[in-house]
Amino acid sequence: EHSFPTRRSSDLIVYSLYTKPYKNSTDLIKKLKSQNLKIINEQFAEKILSKISYFRFKIYLKPFLDTTTKQFKPNSTFEYAYELYSFDEDLKSILFLIIGQIEINLRTKLDQYITSHTNNSFWYLDNKYFINESKIFNTKVSLKNEFLRSKDDFTLHYKENDVNNICNDFKEMPPFWIISELSTFGNILSIFETIDKKPFTLQHNKNVLDELSKEFGANNLKELNSWLKLIRDVRNRVAHHSRVWNCNYREPHGIRQILSSDLNPTQTNKIYLFFVILEILYKNQIVDKNIQQEIKILLNNYPKTRDFIASMEIPQKWLD
């Protein structure tokens, strides 16, 4: 074993050379059994561990592990952990479809509200509508790069025939309704975060951007932006095939305050509040999947997961 001292203020951190050996599926099963994990079907377990890396799978074993003794709790099985894994995989598939619907709605309504108010289909290129010019510039560069790379028929047609007179640095760029088809969720979030509310003021203390936010069930733009950040975080975990079901997340604004006491979570940093946002979006016809029903179906398909709904902070009444 080798130690490598490093400097940090007056402290020394000692690192050890990583020496853990490779273990194949058979070795891993022996290891798990030595930790008191029951494996009902070893052939099945070997097959799973040959398709899913142990490093990835072991996070689903963690709820069954006694962290003090490093032994698995009584009656814990490999199959129960795989049930948790399968629940999470199916949940991600559902969320992928729902978030896709949200994303399409965001692009569409953003363009409808702003273009109709400004009468300018190239509004996203005009700095007068934004409060953070450097951030929106980076977004425009990102969109430009994507547009120039695109070989889609609709982009090729525009590039061969049209330009705009709104912004010389981006004169080859198309109207928002075209570029939005190439935008990432991050691009859209950047626009929502940097857009200036002042040019969108209406009579009677109303604002175009707040009215847009109400389409999604939020009270105002600030609240919607908070939701979008959480949606972005979940979307990124789904897109990278990361664990979703019991992770820590940011708390969205305005959600806990509208829930009755028996529907309020103890911890506000779990996925349940994200599910509540999806409920609101369903009621506002932004998405066509009822997340509450989808979760009930998943729990019926994977009944062992019911033992861990507290890890998602889902109140029992929400499932009744």
Regions found by a protein language model. Give the residues of each.
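Short, small-residue-biased leader/transition segments that mark boundaries at the very start
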Residues: 2-9
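Amphipathic alpha-helical interface elements
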Residues: 10-320
